[in-house]
Amino acid sequence: MHGLLLAAGLLSLPLHVLAHPQPSTSTSLAGRAGAVDLNEFRIAHRSSYTSHDEMKKLPSIASFRQGTYLEVATELVKQTMPNMEFRLVDDHYVGDSGIGHVRFRQTMHGIDIDNSDFNVNVGKDGKVLSHGNSFYTGPAPSSNPMVKRDFIDPMQALHGVRKALNLPIKADGAHVEDMSEHKVMFKGTSGALSDPTAKLCYMAKEDGSLALTWRVETDIGDNWLLSYMDAKESSKVHNVVDYVAHATFQVYKWGLADPTEGKREIITNPWNLKTSPLTWLSDGHNNYTATRGNNAIAQYNPDGGNDYENNYRPSPKNLKFEYPYSPDMNPPKTYIDASVTELFYTSNICHDLYYMLGFNEKAGNFQVNNRGQGGKGNDFVILNAQDGSGTNNANFATPPDGQPGRMRAYIWTRANPPRDASFEAGTIIHEYTHGLSNRLCGGPANSRCLNALESGGMGEGWGDFYATAVRLKPNDTRKTNYVKGGWVNNSPKGVRMYPYSTDMNVNPLVYTSNNKLNEVHAIGTVWCTMLYEVLWNLIDKHGKNDGPVPIFENGVPNDGKYLAMKIVMDGMAIQPCNPNFVQARDAILDADMNLTKGANKCEIWKGFAKRGLGVGAKFDPKNRTGSTQVPNECK
């Protein structure tokens, strides 16, 4: 997992905008008595698509004036839908394949028609590649409803939705606060995870007419609903969109490093709605039935190419990502559905856990839609399973914030039958952590801060550290040793010089070992060995949470494992560009000072000092000085 520029390898290297809302496959409001069947409120399919071949037959396209992809897209909409009122949706971007994606929302009297959209795809040559259209073409309202305001108020709409859908929301005593001209927020409600909102908008109906509605948004956990209540009649709900899709994944559950540690399970809705509120199968523009969503897009990539959007990915009926797999199956392509599913699952869990620990939108995480939380969006992780560009490895490319990360998981040929890296969670976690460290060190806009030998080595070490911390088992102690990459490499020794261990007889590495090392993975093994010592010092002091997520008390994880993961992550953001071991150690100490007021100073110092990075340690690229000393207050 090499950190040169954008590549890393295991061994070498504001609001939700619904452009084309597609309801989830959920058929009812989850987990409640008297639940309403949401299939009754699905939005009808109205969109058309003009392909590239069809576009070439349209002579008017040739007359388009040259300009930016936004100008070209806007001109197309003007020519295709003359005299229509519309606005540009603020989520346009150019994908890594060079296609400019632009979306427009139709409006009437300045009010959105919420299910009337026009999306334009502009190629690298500046010409329209294709477009989709669901603009409303029926009769327009004769007058602006904002003039007479002869519609129900938003509070009536909220009460109407509560009653019609049997929602567990109480609004007695609630009041309305304006957010914009057509949107309000309800304050003082209970039963929802966030304050409900209502937006005045039109909905194009299946019968060809237009309805003025209040779009009431209610997040009740198992369901996140956009309910379109008729603005003239408070008992009529026209449509409902549920952001929450109920899906099952057959995978090796989080915490199992590889197939030798357990059996596959079927897990329902594995996402965390606090960190992935759109779930893993939606980006706020579309809900998907394949391995694609806000955080990642996973697919089969046998030719090893860079084009991914049209590659194969599993898309099961009823969102049941349940596919057969056994390590004895051969050839690997026979279980590609299971491989893509596993890769998608592990990477999304990484997203959710790292988000909890601080790798959020502002920090430069990987998401298409940042929902107004800061940072730059349009940068999910592209996940290529059984990538044909190599073997016996895996890698991760980390461009600056706003550009997608890319992970390639290869087939390993050191066993018979070959082994698929997607099924070794430790490998995938290591790769994803390259994205974490490269975005945090130097800031989201600079992915060039882990490219010196020692800092590049730490990039490898962080990947091993997080992969190892995640795989700790309930009965593990500081005497437990772990190897890295043992399963994929078909070797009990794994792919590192030594196992990760607190026993100096098992792993003798110290800071001055770096004087004889000139390769990032070897140096990374030294760094992770030090972090493993710190990890167990903190676990011995605070205990170990064996659950899949941390428990915070006043912003601090209440156990040693997640505390170590938190302060190591915070240290990445604190340290300078291209740090050395001494600077990174100090950054972790500073992170603990900031988080706990230095309550763990001695545990951290003792962990580093045991491995020669004590008080007197000094960096010199050719002659590092080691030290086992700790501050006087820690003796």
Curated annotation (Swiss-Prot):
Positions annotated as propeptide: 20-246
The residues that carry sugar chains are N287, N475, N594, N623
Q: Which compartment or compartments is the protein found in?
A: Secreted
Against Pfam families, the record matches this protein to: FTP (PF07504), Peptidase_M36 (PF02128)
Q: Which cofactors does it use?
A: Zn(2+)
Q: Which residues form the signal peptide?
A: 1-19
Catalytic residues of the enzyme: E431
The protein's Enzyme Commission number: 3.4.24.-
Whether Protease counts among this entry's keywords is: yes
* Residues where Zn(2+) binds: H430, H434
Q: How is the cofactor bound?
A: Binds 1 zinc ion per subunit.
* GO molecular function list: metalloendopeptidase activity; zinc ion binding
Give the UniProt keywords, A-Z: Glycoprotein, Hydrolase, Metal-binding, Metalloprotease, Protease, Secreted, Signal, Virulence, Zinc, Zymogen
Give Gene Ontology CC terms: extracellular region
Q: What induces it?
A: Expression is strongly increased during growth on protein-rich medium. Expressed at even higher levels when keratin is present in the protein-rich medium.
Which biological process annotations from GO are given for this protein?
proteolysis
Indicate whether Repressor appears among the record's keywords: no
Q: What class of enzyme is it?
A: hydrolase
As for what it does, the entry says:
Secreted metalloproteinase probably acting as a virulence factor.
The UniProt entry's sequence similarity note says:
Belongs to the peptidase M36 family.
Protein name according to UniProt: Extracellular metalloproteinase 1
Per the record, the gene is MEP1
